[in-house]
UniProtKB/Swiss-Prot annotation:
Record field: catalytic activity: dUMP + (6R)-5,10-methylene-5,6,7,8-tetrahydrofolate = 7,8-dihydrofolate + dTMP
Function: Catalyzes the reductive methylation of 2'-deoxyuridine-5'-monophosphate (dUMP) to 2'-deoxythymidine-5'-monophosphate (dTMP) while utilizing 5,10-methylenetetrahydrofolate (mTHF) as the methyl donor and reductant in the reaction, yielding dihydrofolate (DHF) as a by-product. This enzymatic reaction provides an intracellular de novo source of dTMP, an essential precursor for DNA biosynthesis.
Keyword Hydrolase part of the UniProt annotation: no
Native source organism of the sequence: Listeria monocytogenes serotype 4b (strain CLIP80459)
Protein name according to UniProt: Thymidylate synthase
Enzyme class: transferase
Residues annotated as binding (6R)-5,10-methylene-5,6,7,8-tetrahydrofolate: 219, 313
Amino acid sequence: MKQYLDLEKYVLENGTQKGDRTGTGTISTFGYQMRFDLQEGFPIMTTKRVPFKLVVSELLWFLHGDTNIRYLLQHNNNIWNEWAFERFVKSDDYKGEDMTDFGLRAERDSAFKEVYQAEMEKFKARILEDEAFANKYGELGNIYGKQWREWKTSQGETIDQLADLIEMIKTNPNSRRLIVSAWNPKDIPNMALPPCHSLFQFYVADGKLSCQLYQRSADIFLGVPFNIASYALLTHLIAREVGLEVGEFIHTMGDAHLYNNHIEQVKEQLSRTPHKLPKLVLSDKPATIFDFDVADISLDGYNPDPAIKAPISV
């Protein structure tokens, strides 16, 4: 997609070198927006393969209100493993090798990388096999799904923001309050990772549903391709439920950054030519957005260039 390649190029040419929480370092810019017409095809990278089923299972995980990686692992989805693993290795229950700064060390030390990978595999297996262990160490805190579906009020009540949003689109589509927020200051200290994609708003006009996302922190090479596909999918799912066509997905970013250890991968991607976008295919079976399974969602005509691997910064 040209919009995304333009973002990569813009940050390479105009970004500022900054330090960051992970110790990796970034090239960063503040304030950037992309627009995607969802009528023109499903917006997923074609200049590198994005594992769409991982996008699907993560979004369904959010929609279920789940915050434990066990569901993700049951669907062969490893994208949140590092944050749960980090919590475990910092606990008194962990008795293995020292895992301090495991992400950076694994990137720089091949011998340590083997040790880290072995510990991670043991951790994943235990999450899947031991429910009590999973309940304790698979939990990521009150991240996205919890805030979307069970926002706790000061009176001890809960708000299902997503269900309320869908009902409001049906009954008052002209509302300017079609908003869901994952940014809950009270819960931030206990989250494994505070929400990067922190607030989204819907807009109805001419029989079409559009979505705008505000993302406070945007990992351009690894995270943003998932975010684009995820919120485009969410827009399609909600549009189906409320009887509207899809309009635009508008992606607004705060700190949009390229990690310093992703620069060569970005240059490789920029050398590739975008292909035709695929079409999203949704099963007619699910009654509501909350009834979808991974098998109900697929892409037709997705023929991307090969994946480009890059390390994740934790």
